[in-house]
Amino acid sequence: MSSCFGSKKKPIYRKIVILGDGAAGKTSLLNVFTKGYFPQVYEPTIFENYIHDIFVDGNSIELSLWDTAGQEEYDQLRSLSYSDTHVIMICFAVDSRDSLENVITKWLPEVSSNCPGVKLVLVALKCDLRGADEEQVDHSKIIDYEEGLAAAKKINAVRYLECSAKLNRGVNEAFTEAARVALAAQPRGTKDGADESHGTGCIIA
């Protein structure tokens, strides 16, 4: 017997893994997006999974967001996060040139090894520091938009985004764009001989 009530459409599941150096701001970004608050105390993350629903381009999407530890001692544990991933968000902090350098020297090689063919989104964090007083930050060391965009092109990311979790600027936009990319992506990271290329088309920054 058929029901006279229409069944609710099931959300589309997409998995996004968030990578980047320790203290880059990944967990703060996720807290603001999923819980609506900015943590005042830094607590290093070993591993955490967030589930958050989002509506993009007429589609209801269930995002599984995997927060990972950036410290070297967790490299093996982090490798377990990559299975069946649709998009990887690689993050760096605009006040840490090491974190941007590691996008290319550490994170890209790790992704290529564990999750070949996955779509990449590069995200600049702590962008509020660009407007901070000289007493708070050395502006000669701050990474500007053009440098971030150049890095995104170098790793063949399909999006380059900038945000401030502290001010809640660009946070929703970052995950909306990542979800949009994930919608059209195939899951990677199953060691199935996937295509090694990380992205096609031009960056939308």
Swiss-Prot record:
GTP binds at residues 20-27, 67-71, 125-128. It is found in: Cell membrane. It is a lipid-anchor. The modification Cysteine methyl ester is found at C202. Gene3D superfamilies: P-loop containing nucleotide triphosphate hydrolases. The keyword Protease does not apply. Keywords: Cell cycle, Cell division, Cell membrane, Cell shape, GTP-binding, Lipoprotein, Membrane, Methylation, Nucleotide-binding, Prenylation. SUPFAM superfamilies: P-loop containing nucleoside triphosphate hydrolases. Pfam families: Ras (PF00071). Palmitoylated by the erf2-erf4 complex. A lipid is attached at C202 (S-geranylgeranyl cysteine). NCBIfam families: small_GTP. Belongs to the small GTPase superfamily. Rho family. This is GTP-binding protein rho3. The gene is rho3.
